[in-house]
């Protein structure tokens, strides 16, 4: 049996508490508060919260474990171990120092165009590793994009992942990063929901604040339609048949140029392709990685020179 020393608490999510830990000399239990380290490499220990109704939390843990066992990529956080202790599932992951939300919110950090290009390319490569295995992440946001001390991206928090082709709930993805088809109640969706989320993260790297920060689903849709235009059947066949479709105010189709004056034409083109309302027309991850934006000047900032 492997034993881990659990040290300080790192953070807390919807269904788990995360602690800093280290491998220790084996004892009669997998988790201890003190002991002798056998490795100085830290790990993140994710303890699934105990509740009276644990089934939902356990399902999330199982989804995360299954997905991470399948994905082998330097752009995705690595699964190290799993165990049950004190009636709680624990997931041991590689420890990563910070996340993209912290970087974006840190006003002392200057984010240059090459930095944005490097980070969003790594995010896309991580998402591609999911999509090629027919896994939808369903919760891409800056807080779930971990950043190493060198600036390397690691996608994390796979508790909402599902396989492409399953009929699903629309209540996935944090609202600010949720695709319009989800906001309108679609249960028949796929990998394009992740691409919308990537677009929102891309925009946030330029703006340093969330692009669409609605307090309700209706307000969220209104903000999206104000910026991108209200969808019509001609451009998005079937939109009016979605379960939560309403007779929304008609806003004209607009360009993002005014909001992103510092973005290059290639960056704007990729952003508009990611934030396409009709999911059938939204750019795929593979095509996004091949977009001319990543070949244009300036080049992506090298690992080790990113502002972390």
UniProtKB/Swiss-Prot annotation:
Residues 4-294 form the Protein kinase domain. Keywords: ATP-binding, Cell cycle, Cell division, Kinase, Nucleotide-binding, Nucleus, Serine/threonine-protein kinase, Transcription, Transcription regulation, Transferase. ATP binds at residues 10-18, 46. GO terms for cellular component: cytoplasm; transcription factor TFIIK complex. Its EC number is 2.7.11.23. It catalyses: [DNA-directed RNA polymerase] + ATP = phospho-[DNA-directed RNA polymerase] + ADP + H(+). It is found in: Nucleus. Pfam families: Pkinase (PF00069). Its main location: nucleus. PROSITE patterns: PROTEIN_KINASE_DOM, PROTEIN_KINASE_ST. It is an enzyme of class 2 (transferase). The keyword Cell division applies. GO terms for molecular function: ATP binding; cyclin-dependent protein serine/threonine kinase activity; RNA polymerase II CTD heptapeptide repeat kinase activity. GO terms for biological process: cell division; positive regulation of transcription by RNA polymerase II. The active site is at 139 (proton acceptor). InterPro entries: CDK, Kinase-like_dom_sf, Prot_kinase_dom, Ser/Thr_kinase_AS. Belongs to the protein kinase superfamily. CMGC Ser/Thr protein kinase family. CDC2/CDKX subfamily. Protein kinase component of transcription factor IIH (TFIIH) which phosphorylates the C-terminal domain of RNA polymerase II during transition from transcription to elongation after preinitiation complex (PIC) formation, thereby positively regulating transcription. Essential for both basal and activated transcription, and is involved in nucleotide excision repair (NER) of damaged DNA. Component of the TFIIH holo complex. This is Probable serine/threonine-protein kinase KIN28 homolog. It comes from Encephalitozoon cuniculi (strain GB-M1) (Microsporidian parasite). The lineage of its organism: Eukaryota, Fungi, Fungi incertae sedis, Microsporidia, Unikaryonidae.
């Amino acid at each position: 049996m492997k034993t881990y020393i659990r040290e300080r608490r790192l953070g807390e999510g919807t269904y788990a508490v995360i602690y800093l830990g280290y491998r220790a000399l084996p004892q009669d239990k997998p988790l201890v508060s003190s002991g002798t380290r056998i490795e100085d490499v830290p790990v993140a220990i994710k303890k699934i919260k105990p509740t009276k109704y644990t089934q939902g939390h356990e399902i999330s843990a199982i989804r995360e474990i299954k997905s991470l066992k399948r994905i082998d990529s330097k752009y995705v956080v690595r699964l190290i171990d799993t165990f049950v202790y004190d009636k709680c599932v624990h997931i041991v992951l590689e420890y990563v120092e910070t996340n993209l939300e912290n970087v974006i919110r840190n006003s002392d950090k200057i984010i240059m165009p090459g930095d944005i290009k490097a980070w969003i390319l790594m995010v896309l490569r991580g998402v591609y590793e999911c999509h090629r295995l027919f896994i939808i992440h369903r919760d891409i946001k800056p807080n779930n994009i971990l950043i190493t001390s060198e600036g390397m991206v690691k996608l994390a928090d796979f508790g909402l992942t599902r396989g492409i082709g399953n009929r699903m709930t629309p209540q996935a993805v944090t609202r600010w990063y949720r695709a319009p088809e989800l906001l309108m109640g679609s249960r028949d969706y796929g990998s394009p929901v992740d691409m919308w989320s990537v677009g929102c993260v891309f925009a946030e790297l330029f703006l340093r604040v969330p692009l669409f920060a609605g307090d309700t689903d209706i307000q969220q849709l209104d903000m999206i339609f104000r910026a991108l235009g209200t969808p019509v059947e001609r451009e998005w066949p079937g939109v009016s048949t979605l379960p939560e479709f309403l007779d929304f105010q008609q806003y004209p189709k607009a360009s993002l140029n005014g909001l992103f004056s510092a973005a290059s034409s290639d960056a704007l083109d990729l952003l508009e392709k990611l934030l396409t309302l009709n999911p059938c027309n939204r750019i795929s991850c593979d095509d996004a990685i091949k977009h001319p934006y990543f070949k244009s000047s300036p080049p992506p900032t090298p690992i080790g020179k990113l502002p972390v």
